[in-house]
Amino acid sequence: MSSKNLAGYLLAISPIVMIVMFAAVFPAVLGTGEEGLKGEALAKASIEAGMEHVHLTYVVATIGGLAMMGMFLGYTLWARLLQGDDKKGNALVVVASIAMPVAAAGMMMSMDFNFAAARAWIKGDEVNALTIQAVAEYAGNNFIWTFIFLSVGFTGLASALQTTDKISKTVGYILAIISVIMLITVSYTHLTLPTSDLV
């Protein structure tokens, strides 16, 4: 299978699987704890919701995490396919192909905190479990997503600049615009978040 085909399959399938796992299956089957909780109460509720069916939690989280990594790999391959010194937007996709794996590594570390919290909770180490889960709740909220949206936007823009097909060009520009909007939204949300919501 060529890199182009692999990137296409990953970008077509992985986001769907990820959304289904994290947005539909996880809340429906495992629950998310009570709404409006903060701090230690939020961390404890998150762990308890997952520990009620711990093996199912591991399966759902693993499938969702692998789908997320597949999506990141798809974007990385897409960015690398667009590289070339004589191609428009080469600098953009060079940056994207470096930034996306960095973001993926950060997201993997953030997810691994959840697994670590679960292991600590199962062993009866509630204090460390709550501490690790609190880190997992807030880790990767802004900086990692900045890398992701920039990478996706750069790749979409470079694709639009290089292609001659009107549909592909339109899709590339739309992807770039959506990435900019999401980047601004995430940054604005965190910059205007009340101090009371951070603790």
Where are the regions a protein language model picked out?
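Interfacial helix-start motif at the membrane-water boundary
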Residues: 47-68
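Interfacial segments of alpha-helical transmembrane regions
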Residues: 85-104, 171
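Transmembrane alpha-helix/helix-exit interface in multi-pass inner-membrane proteins
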Residues: 101-123
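Alpha-helical transmembrane segments in multipass membrane proteins, preferentially the mid-helix core
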Residues: 148-167
